[in-house]
Amino acid sequence: MTQERSPSDGTPLIQPADIADIRREYTRGGLRRGDLPANPLDLFERWLKQACEAKLADPTAMSVATVDERGQPYQRIVLLKHYDEKGMVFYTNMGSRKAHHLENNPRISLLFPWHVLERQVMVLGRVEKLPALEVLKYFHSRPKDSQIGAWVSKQSSRISARGVLESKFLELKQKFQNGEVPLPSFWGGFRVVIDSVEFWQGGEHRLHDRFFYQRQEENWQIDRLAP
């Protein structure tokens, strides 16, 4: 380990000598073709259940990747709120950066990083906007403070200080204290229509198991990929 001294107070800053040395072996077990159901959602459901049972923090958290009009990728963590044969659902401010990206380019990638279980799942697809009634039903299932929070933030816009948000939140909390919080016109959701899913399971000696499901009309083609 090397030490550097802070120019302000002389406190040593300890940094890894070489982050390339940070590694570990993956030993929790492999994934074999005989383990695979015909439908990737069945395996996803099994793995998600196991992630919940393992008490992972935020097991439904997924990295959502979009690209802007210049082709610049962006990522952020969003919570999965529903999935079925139609696709995977998340909600957002429709004035946000990701919503603008998806308006121009509906292609999207999701990644579920279940590190403790030595697993990850990547989903590729395209989005479609959710119907208003579906959005309304979910919005009113949220805690009331979260509903108010949706009104407060003009997501991805520049603000001068956190106090701007806190003041607006208190103002709206007072306004809606005795009634229902209406659905903001700028708040909605997307369904990711799935084109392909890749399941990754860590393996010993970096011989990881990767299986790629590709939609083929009514069925799924399954291929093993080299690690």
Swiss-Prot record:
EC number: 1.4.3.5
Pathway: Cofactor metabolism; pyridoxal 5'-phosphate salvage; pyridoxal 5'-phosphate from pyridoxamine 5'-phosphate: step 1/1; Cofactor metabolism; pyridoxal 5'-phosphate salvage; pyridoxal 5'-phosphate from pyridoxine 5'-phosphate: step 1/1
Presence of keyword Flavoprotein: yes
Catalytic reaction annotation: pyridoxamine 5'-phosphate + O2 + H2O = pyridoxal 5'-phosphate + H2O2 + NH4(+); pyridoxine 5'-phosphate + O2 = pyridoxal 5'-phosphate + H2O2
Annotated TM spans: none
Domain of life: Bacteria
Positions annotated to bind substrate: R23, R24, E25, Y26, K81, Y138, R142, S146, R206, L207, H208
Amino-acid positions noted as binding FMN in the UniProt annotation, renumbered to this chain: 76-81, 91-92, 97-98, 120, 155-156, 200, 210
Annotated GO MF terms: FMN binding; pyridoxamine phosphate oxidase activity
Cofactor: how and how many bound: Binds 1 FMN per subunit.
UniProt-listed GO biological process terms: pyridoxine biosynthetic process
Keywords: Flavoprotein, FMN, Oxidoreductase, Pyridoxine biosynthesis
UniProt xrefs under NCBIfam families: pdxH, PRK05679.1
Function: Catalyzes the oxidation of either pyridoxine 5'-phosphate (PNP) or pyridoxamine 5'-phosphate (PMP) into pyridoxal 5'-phosphate (PLP).
Family under the similarity heading: Belongs to the pyridoxamine 5'-phosphate oxidase family.
PANTHER family per the UniProt record, alphabetical: PYRIDOXINE-5'-PHOSPHATE OXIDASE, PYRIDOXINE-5-PHOSPHATE OXIDASE
Quaternary structure and interacting proteins, as annotated: Homodimer.
HAMAP family from the UniProt entry: PdxH
Name of the molecule in the record: Pyridoxine/pyridoxamine 5'-phosphate oxidase
Organism of derivation: Pectobacterium atrosepticum (strain SCRI 1043 / ATCC BAA-672) (Erwinia carotovora subsp. atroseptica)
Phylogenetic placement of the source organism: Bacteria, Pseudomonadati, Pseudomonadota, Gammaproteobacteria, Enterobacterales
Protein's gene: pdxH
